[in-house]
Amino acid sequence: MNCLSRTILFSGLISAFSLGQISPTQVGAANRQPPNVVVIFIDDMGYADIGPFGAKAYPTPHLDRMAREGRKFTDFYVTQAVCSASRAGLLTGCYNVRVGIFGALGPGARHGINASEMTLAEICKQKDYATAIYGKWHLGHHKQFLPMQHGFDDYFG
């Protein structure tokens, strides 16, 4: 997938969030703010493991409220069923093999996400969004592969 296709894909994603957040009375508002976008990406989670998708065993009130007040997507696909590869797919919009991530990257891995790959965070930065990632990165452990080199303003993980 080339950069233009990825830009269109991610612009469409942002637009989908935006359209769901605008009421008819807001359409003409001159000071309309872009929507907040939160992507939650969890390894090995079942469909009904959180409240918005039916979990009853434990409360998830903040996730429930986010789902109620925003957009909730119900169909999910990953490029591969391991952490590093599926993260690479989500962040680049490309198949993991296309971007050189063939499986899970352990602490001894010498490679990671290539600097030439455009990420979702970099596209969001072009639209003046602040970006952050919290939790497991798993796309390379050397400085050139870390989140701050790929469009994220803040990282803890």
What are the functions of these language-model segments?
Residues N2-L4, I8-G157:
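Formylglycine-dependent sulfatase
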